[in-house]
C-alpha cells in the first residue's frame, strides 16, 4: 500500500539478488515481472475496465519501480565477484576469492548501499525527478485479483518447480560463499539441474528466452569494436600515465574518477578491462607496490560500477532494459532513464568518492 516501502523493497531485493546472481539476470527477471503487470492493465484497458488516463498512470508507476530496481542491481552488483562481469576480471587479476572480494569492497559498497536506500526514500517522498507516481487502490486490486487467480490455477507440479528453484537458489548462495567451484561451473550446474528437474529437454523450449537479449547482444558487439579501437590506439594510456605520475594518496581517488567518467560514456566492463591490464603492467614493472595495486583495484571496481548508472551506456543492465520489449511499452526512453537516474548518480558517485578517499 505504501509506494515508498514498495520502492525500497524493489531496491533491496534487486541489490541482494544481484550480489549472488548478476545484475543482468536480475534485470531480466524484473523486466518479466513488469511485462506481466503491464499486460494485466493492458487487458483491463481493452475490456474498458480502466480509462486511458489510469493506464498512463500505471505506466508512470511501473517506470518508477523499474528504475528503482535497475539502480538496486548496480548497488548489489558492485559488492561481489559475480555481481558484474568486470568484477570477475578484477578479482582474477588481483587473486581474490568471493569473500575476500566482498570484504575488500565493503568499506565503499556498504556506505554507498545505505546512501542509495536513503536516496530512494527521499526522491519518492518529495516526488522529485519525476518520481512519486501513485497507483489507486482500484488499480492495485486488479493485480491482487490476478495474482489470486494465478495462484488458484497453479498445479502441484508448478509448486514443486518453485520449491526446486528456491532450493537451487540457496545452493547458489552457499556455493559462491564457500567458493566450492569456479563461478562458471556453478552456473552450468544450476542450468543443468534446473532444466533437468523442470523436465525441459528440448532446445526449442529454451529458445524464446534468448530472443529478449538479441538487440542487447548486437549493441555489445559494437562496444567490443569501440574498445578494440581504444586499446589499439592506446587512447586511455595518457590518462593512466597522468594518474600514475601523481602522489600515492591521489592515485586512488583519481583512478575512481577517471574510471567513473569513462564508464558513463563507454561500457564499464571494457573500461575496467583496459585499466586493470594497465595496473597489472605497472605492478610487473615495479611502478606500484602490491598494496597500492589492491587499492587501485578497489577504485577501479567501484569507479566503474557506481558513476556508470548515469547512462544506459555504462551499465549493461540499464542497456538491456533500454533495448528490451518493456521500454517502449511503458514509454522508457534514453533521456528519461538518464534524468531519473540523476539523483542516484550524484549520491552514489559522491558517497563512493568520499569512501575511497577516507577508507581505502
Label the model's feature ranges.
Residues 323-347:
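Interfacial loop-to-transmembrane junctions
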Residues 80, 133-138, 310-318:
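Juxtamembrane non-transmembrane "cap" segments at the membrane-aqueous interface
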Residues 11, 15, 68-74, 113, ...:
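Small-residue faces within membrane-embedded alpha-helices
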Residues 1, 39, 208-211, 241-245, ...:
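Short amphipathic alpha-helical coupling elements at transmembrane boundaries
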Amino acid at each position: 500500500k505504501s509506494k515508498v516501502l514498495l520502492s525500497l523493497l524493489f531496491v533491496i531485493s534487486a541489490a541482494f539478488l544481484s550480489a549472488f546472481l548478476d545484475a543482468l539476470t536480475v534485470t531480466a527477471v524484473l523486466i518479466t515481472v513488469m511485462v506481466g503487470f503491464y499486460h494485466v492493465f493492458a487487458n483491463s484497458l481493452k475490456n474498458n475496465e480502466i480509462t486511458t488516463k489510469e493506464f498512463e498512470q500505471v505506466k508512470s508507476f511501473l517506470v518508477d519501480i523499474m528504475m528503482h530496481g535497475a539502480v538496486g542491481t548496480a548497488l548489489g552488483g558492485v559488492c561481489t565477484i559475480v555481481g558484474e562481469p568486470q568484477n570477475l576480471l578484477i578479482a582474477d587479476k588481483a587473486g581474490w576469492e568471493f569473500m575476500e572480494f566482498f570484504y575488500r569492497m565493503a568499506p565503499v559498497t556498504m556506505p554507498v548501499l545505505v546512501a542509495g536506500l536513503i536516496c530512494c526514500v527521499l526522491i519518492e517522498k518529495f516526488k522529485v525527478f519525476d518520481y512519486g507516481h501513485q497507483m489507486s487502490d482500484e488499480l492495485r486490486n486488479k493485480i491482487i485479483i490476478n495474482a489470486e487467480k494465478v495462484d488458484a490455477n497453479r498445479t502441484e507440479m508448478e509448486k514443486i518447480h518453485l520449491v526446486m528453484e528456491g532450493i537451487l537458489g540457496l545452493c547458489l548462495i552457499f556455493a559462491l560463499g564457500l567458493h566450492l567451484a569456479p563461478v562458471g561451473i556453478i552456473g552450468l550446474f544450476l542450468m543443468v539441474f534446473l532444466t533437468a528437474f523442470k523436465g525441459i529437454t528440448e532446445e526449442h523450449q529454451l529458445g524464446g528466452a534468448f530472443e529478449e537479449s538479441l538487440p542487447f547482444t548486437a549493441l555489445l558487439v559494437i562496444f567490443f569494436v569501440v574498445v578494440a579501437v581504444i586499446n589499439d590506439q592506446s587512447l586511455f594510456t595518457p590518462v593512466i600515465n597522468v594518474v600514475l605520475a601523481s602522489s600515492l594518496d591521489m592515485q586512488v581517488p583519481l583512478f575512481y574518477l577517471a574510471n567513473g567518467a569513462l564508464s558513463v560514456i563507454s561500457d564499464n566492463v571494457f573500461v575496467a578491462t583496459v585499466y586493470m591490464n594497465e595496473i597489472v603492467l605497472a605492478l610487473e614493472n615495479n611502478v606500484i607496490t602490491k598494496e597500492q595495486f589492491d587499492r587501485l583495484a578497489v577504485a577501479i571496481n567501484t569507479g566503474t560500477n557506481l558513476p556508470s548508472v548515469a547512462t544506459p551506456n555504462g551499465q549493461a543492465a540499464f542497456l538491456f532494459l533500454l533495448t528490451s520489449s518493456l521500454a517502449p511499452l511503458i514509454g522508457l526512453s534514453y533521456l528519461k532513464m538518464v534524468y531519473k537516474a540523476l539523483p542516484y548518480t550524484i549520491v552514489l558517485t559522491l558517497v563512493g568518492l568520499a569512501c575511497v578517499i577516507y577508507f581505502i
